[in-house]
């Protein structure tokens, strides 16, 4: 088998779909046991966060059109997978992620904000909002053909759901099952996949801007290999 054929995207990557189903199972199970059995959030939060963490692998693959050779399928699945992440549409995430690849460790890299460690990683959502809206203004695409940018509309709609939740008395469930897990999950993902691989964020060469993790997570020991395998699905 040639290298091109070996790594060519198949008609459909079923393993990625299985991971998507697994991630959604965690996330939806947390919603079910919370709403039906009133299980305390101390138990549902970890379940929701595990779901969000698991879903990141297929979300990442969708941004690179790696789930299917059909781009429409990638986009459709991406729009479904992004739902638990609350703060962003799939198109917004794709733009930010591809900007990271285009400008890794440079000033224009949206993930460079994570360089201060866990504290900055937990604030990544605010930074991403600033980065994305600033890019819309600079590209003069906030309004297109007389209509508000669809990604802005998506974000407004999500926050409108929060307002509706407040009015009908389910705001606590929305926060516990959707917003807080998304906030924590994104912070955790940022730390593991933004800060750790690129920490010190000084190298911009494509062969040196990513580094391995020393210590418990080092790839040179059996424990590290097992942990990395779990973290990266």
Task: List each model region and its residues.
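Non-catalytic, topology-defining segments of multipass membrane proteins
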Residues: 1-54, 83-180
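Membrane-helix interface segments
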Residues: 37-42, 69-76, 170-172, 223-227
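Transmembrane alpha-helical segments that form the membrane-embedded catalytic/substrate-channel core
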Residues: 49-59, 91, 182-205
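Active-site recognition of the HExxH zinc-binding catalytic motif
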Residues: 57-64, 68, 100-101
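Juxtamembrane helix-capping/reentrant segments at transmembrane boundaries
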Residues: 67-87, 108-120, 205-224
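Juxtamembrane/interfacial segments around transmembrane helices
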Residues: 71-80, 98-103, 126-136, 201-212
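Cytosolic-facing loops and C-terminal tails of multi-pass membrane proteins
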Residues: 166-171, 179-180, 210-230
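Cytosolic/matrix-facing juxtamembrane and C-terminal tails of multi-pass cellular membrane proteins
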Residues: 198, 205, 227-233
């Amino acid at each position: 088998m040639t290298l091109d054929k070996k790594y060519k995207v198949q008609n459909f990557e079923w393993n990625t779909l299985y991971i998507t189903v697994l991630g959604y199972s965690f996330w939806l199970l947390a919603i079910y046991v919370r709403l039906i059995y009133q299980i305390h959030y101390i138990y549902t939060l970890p379940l929701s966060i595990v779901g969000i963490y698991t879903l990141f692998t297929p979300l990442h693959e969708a941004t690179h059109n790696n789930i299917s050779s059909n781009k429409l399928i990638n986009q459709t699945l991406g729009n479904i997978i992004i739902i638990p992440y609350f703060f962003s549409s799939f198109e917004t995430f794709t733009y930010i992620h591809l900007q990271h690849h285009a400008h890794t460790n440079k000033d224009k890299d949206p993930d460079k904000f994570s360089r201060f460690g866990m504290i900055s990683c937990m604030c990544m959502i605010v930074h991403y909002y600033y980065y994305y809206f600033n890019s819309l203004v600079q590209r003069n695409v906030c309004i297109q053909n007389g209509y508000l940018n669809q990604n802005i509309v998506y974000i407004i709609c999500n926050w409108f759901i929060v307002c509706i939740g407040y009015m009908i008395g389910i705001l606590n469930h929305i926060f516990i099952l959707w917003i807080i897990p998304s906030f924590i999950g994104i912070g955790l993902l940022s730390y593991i996949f933004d800060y750790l691989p690129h920490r010190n964020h000084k190298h911009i060469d494509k062969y040196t801007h990513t580094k391995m993790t020393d210590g418990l997570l080092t790839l040179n020991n059996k424990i590290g290999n097992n942990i990395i395998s779990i973290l990266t699905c």
